Amino acid sequence: MTIAWVIALNKPFYPLYVWYLVGDGVTASLGSLIATPIFLAIPFIARRSSLAARLALPLVGTLDTLFETKLFGPDSGTELFFAACMLLVAVSFRAGERWWQRGAAVFVFVVFVFSRNWMGMPLYAWSSDDLSILLNLNAFAVASLTTFIALRYAGIVHATAPDAEDRR
């Protein structure tokens, strides 16, 4: 099962977790479902272009993380998902795709910096108790996702041939 499928299939449960654990903000948390169709499209994109799909997953994840950080606020821990996006960038590309990989890494980092400095107030006013619960939920979700990514890519070696750039 691809990472995109795992993300897409888990997204509908997030508002349920918010409802069960927090009680408030369920309607606001439905916004977390917006990117689900895009995550569902990534395996189909892969049929036409594996590079496009390998680019799409961390980039869509990054933009989804940015939106959810605006929705929930940085104190909710949603920014932790940037780490999963960067991990995807680190493991998803082949040796000949290093410039795509570098561009994706810079994109994830720039969006992260933007989220830390210029996001403003969250779209929903969460209490400090709610944010504490969301932080725990999101920390567990990120740990689970990064573990799944590591297990998925375990043992995959991307062939590298030294070139002039590597010898500098």
Name each model feature, range by range:
Residues P12-I34, A95-I156:
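Alpha-helical transmembrane segments and their interfaces in multipass membrane proteins
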Residues D24, D64, D75, D129-D130, ...:
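Acidic-enriched, low-complexity/disordered segments with a strong bias for Aspartate over Glutamate
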Residues T2-G73, A83-L88, A105-V108:
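Hydrophobic transmembrane alpha-helices and their membrane-interface boundaries in multi-pass
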Residues V89-A95:
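Interfacial segments of multi-pass membrane proteins
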Residues G77-F81:
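Transmembrane helix boundary and interhelical junction motifs in multipass membrane proteins
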Residues A150, A154-R168:
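Heptad-repeat alpha-helical coiled-coil signal-transmission segments
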Residues K70, V91, A159:
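Charged/polar, solvent-exposed surface patches and flexible loops
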